[in-house]
Amino acid sequence: MKNFLIILTFLFTFLAPATAASTKTVMVFGDSLSASHGMPIEAGWVALLTQRLQTKFTDYQIINASISGETTLGGRNRIKQSLETHRPEIVILELGANDGLRGATIKSIYENLATIIEICKKNNSQVLLVGMQLPPNYGRTYTRKFQAIFPQLAENYQIKLIPFLLAGFGEKHEFFQADGIHPNEVAQKKIVETVWEVLQTMIKTEKIAANPDN
């Protein structure tokens, strides 16, 4: 009996880490738009994306490292720790909206996001950058320059881009909560489709690269 327990302990010690290592991670690194603001966590697009991922790619999991109110500077300060903790293969980077709403300089937003991307790349994490837009009352020049940040970063760092997280409903009031800023539960289903379209392609490409002979 003692020998049997020793064998079981040996198997658990060496096989369990292998099983854990086979699970790959997608980390969502964002603000309140990704943190289920104003609704149950299970109703948010990240939870819906998790369900989709578990159905289509069972060897992947999602970690939501989003914080309501987060800025690009805040993300820059905590990205290293998040990468060390979760070791994601893919990072969905959804930051910048709060900076824009507060009128932060275009230069600071760009540089903070660029630093986050560079750190992710150094840690061998692919980046899926999520673009945002601002309401027109922030001025034509500022809103245009803000919107241009995301495609510029995607081109400069050769990373995947979702041009606008709220594509298809960004100007439709019925898809927003009472504050007029945060998407409601109905809109979450639209967001997950927007994200999934790009994410699934990244995962498929990664699988092909990992198993070129299959």
Q: What are the language-model segments listed below?
A:
Residues F12-T13, I41, T194:
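Alpha-helical transmembrane segments and their juxtamembrane interfaces
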Residues L15-A16, G44, E197:
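Residues in and immediately flanking transmembrane alpha helices
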Residues L33-S36, P40, S66-E70, N98-G100, ...:
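Short histidine/acidic/glycine/proline-rich micro-motifs that form metal-
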Residues T19-S68, R78-R87:
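Serine-esterase "nucleophile elbow" of acetyl-processing enzymes
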Residues M1-F4:
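Positively charged n-region of N-terminal signal peptides that target proteins for export
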Residues A21, L48-Q51, R76-N214:
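Alpha-helical cap/lid subdomain in secreted, periplasmic
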Residues I6-F14:
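Bacterial N-terminal signal peptides
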Residues L73:
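Alpha-helical elements of the RecA-like P-loop NTPase motor core of helicases
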